[in-house]
Structures are given as C-alpha cells and as structure tokens.
Amino acid sequence: MLLCVVCLGVGGCSSLPRQDGSSRNGGSSGGTGGNVGVLSGVSQGDASDAAIYAVGLVGTPYRYGANTPASGFDCSGLIGHVYKTRTGLNLPRSVAALQQWGQSVQGQELRAGDLVFFGRGAVASHAGVYVGQGRFVHAPSSGGTVRLDLLSAKYWAAQRLQYRRP
C-alpha cells in the first residue's frame, strides 16, 4: 500500500509507446473559471531560455522518478529541472500538479517555454516543454531518451489536453 502511495506521489509520466518518425511562485489567482493556477511570474525571456536549455537535453536517457542529466529524466522531472536550472523555480513534481500550475493558454497562443499536456482523460499523464515551431521536448518512455517531437504528430495530436504558461 505504501509503495502505491509513493508511486502516485512521484507520478512522473505514463509509459508511452515508442515512435519513429519555490519558492518564487506567486499566490493563486481566481476569477477565471479555473484557467489560472499558481502564477510564477516567469518572464518570456526566461521561458525562452528554459526552452533552449530543454533542447540541449535531447538524448538524455529516460528514467522514471529521475530529474537530473546524470540520472536521467521522467517527463515531470525534465520540466522541473529545466525550470529550476534556468529560472530558480521549484515546480510541482507530478504531471497532475503541473497541470494546475501557471495560466491556461490556447494552442495558437503557444510560446517557447509553455508546458504541453497529454492524456486520454481529464487528468494529464504526460507533459513536455514547447520550444517553438510546433515542437516540444519531453521524456517519453522507459527505454527511450529525451526527444524533440511535433505537436502535430498523429499520436500526440490525438492526446493533447492543455497548454499552460508559467
């Protein structure tokens, strides 16, 4: 039972099929029907820097529960490491908690550094960092590596749930 609770708490990412092809956080803001979560105050420059840094981590091994270049990354560990390293923010460690963080944005409003969420239900099971030009960086599955993928790829387009801006 304790093991189940620990696994749910870490909640990195679901295993996805292979494909070829803080402390600085502000308070909660209300009044927009749940579209605004914890606002961080990350500047666009810092968010872009985080996206560039994320691209540099492509090829790092996937490892469930890991969050450093030396140990590898799961999806939430990758996002947390990128934002901690480039902005000093301590982000939530689970995809479900990240899904409540920042401000909801529409797909046509995406900017480098925004977070993208995927899943088949209301709660996301996977997330990545948008880097521009329709692409995102993520740590997708056991046995894989951090990679750059297109949001428009059939697999990802079918699962897109939400976009959030730090």
Stretches found by the model and what they are:
Residues 46-50, 54, 74-75, 79:
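Stable alpha-helical elements in mature extracytoplasmic
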Residues 14-42, 46, 89, 105, ...:
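Aromatic- and glycine-rich peptidoglycan recognition patches
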Residues 113-114, 134:
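Structural motif
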Residues 8-12:
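C-terminal motif of bacterial Sec signal peptides marking the signal peptidase cleavage site
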Residues 37-40, 60-112:
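Catalytic cysteine-centered active-site loop
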Residues 1-2:
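Bacterial N-terminal signal peptides that target proteins for export
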